[in-house]
């Protein structure tokens, strides 16, 4: 069963080009992750980390649509998922950002991961707002 988790849309204090550039180098992602994210490792195109009670997750950049959308996909993860970062220009110095995570989950798994994923999205977007 396809399950979507969506963040609120927030305003980042970077224009869409600068934010896109930061998010397409996964080494920069550590600066935007909540403090409760553990075991973060990265290179330019891949990263892995652990969130609360969830298993360790690994991501790679799958698609880039200049200054608008980045699609990440899971690799070597017990729970396969895609994560999308949507970026749109707000004004010349800021952009609107939202994050979406899509997973194939049965009902039981959805109940187990719903809270940690939503907490992660809330904290992640709060950090993006402070950029």
For each predicted feature, which ranges?
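Hydrophobic ligand-binding cavity/cleft-lining segments
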Residues: 1-41
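Intrinsic-disorder/low-complexity, polar/charged segments enriched in Ser/Thr/Lys/Arg/Asp/Glu/Gln
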Residues: 3-9, 46, 56, 82, ...
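Hydrophobic pocket/interface hotspot
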Residues: 19-23, 29, 47, 61, ...
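A conserved amphipathic terminal alpha-helix motif
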Residues: 102-131
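Residue-level recognition of beta-strand termini and adjacent short loop/turns
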Residues: 41-43, 91
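Hydrophobic-ligand binding "helix-grip"
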Residues: 52-94, 102
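Short, solvent-exposed secondary-structure boundary motifs
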Residues: 1-2, 26-32, 47-54, 72-78
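Amphipathic alpha-helical hairpins
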Residues: 10, 32, 69-70, 115, ...
């Amino acid at each position: 069963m396809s399950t979507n988790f969506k963040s609120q849309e927030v305003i980042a204090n970077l224009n869409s080009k600068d934010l896109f550039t930061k998010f397409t180098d996964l080494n920069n992602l550590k600066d935007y992750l909540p403090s409760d994210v553990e075991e973060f490792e990265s290179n330019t195109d891949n990263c892995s980390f652990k969130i609360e009670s969830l298993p360790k997750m690994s991501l790679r950049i799958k698609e880039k649509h200049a200054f608008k959308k980045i699609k990440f996909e899971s690799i070597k993860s017990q729970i396969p998922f895609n994560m999308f970062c949507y970026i749109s220009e707000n004004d010349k110095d800021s952009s609107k950002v939202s994050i979406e995570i899509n997973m194939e989950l049965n009902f039981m798994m959805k109940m187990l991961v719903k809270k940690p994923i939503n907490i992660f999205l809330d904290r992640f977007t709060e950090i993006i707002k402070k950029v």
